[in-house]
């Protein structure tokens, strides 16, 4: 299926690129999320009129992501969790908890931007966690997992 990309899509193309993708990828991902439109003559003409404003919006998103990445550089965020004496967590720390800790520190992060491809954190310690703020911007932050002080 031939499409025109409305925004940059990782491993596919940039704004305005005409790409050929499998119909399922187009139907289930690109079209419903507004990342692309079918490459009909009408859409091609309409896109050429709107190209400048779409590119400007994409540049603004990139600038915002770079600004957030600058704020996040060399930062350590502490998360406390209930843990055993050996340092194993009761439960785990996933993208939601990491995003919440960073947001509470004053930098807005969504859980979909946290890349825990190695799986959730299950031990006390320091971890380097990558954040994907934009298709072109990623930054690593340190997450320090500490046991909760329990005096039982």
From Swiss-Prot:
InterPro entries: Ribosomal_bL9, Ribosomal_bL9/RNase_H1_N, Ribosomal_bL9_bac/chp, Ribosomal_bL9_C, Ribosomal_bL9_C_sf, Ribosomal_bL9_N, Ribosomal_bL9_N_sf. One of its GO terms (molecular function) is structural constituent of ribosome. Gene3D superfamilies: Ribosomal protein L9, C-terminal domain, Ribosomal protein L9, N-terminal domain. GO terms for cellular component: ribonucleoprotein complex; ribosome. Keywords: Ribonucleoprotein, Ribosomal protein, RNA-binding, rRNA-binding. Binds to the 23S rRNA. HAMAP family: Ribosomal_bL9. Belongs to the bacterial ribosomal protein bL9 family. This is Large ribosomal subunit protein bL9. It comes from Coxiella burnetii (strain Dugway 5J108-111).
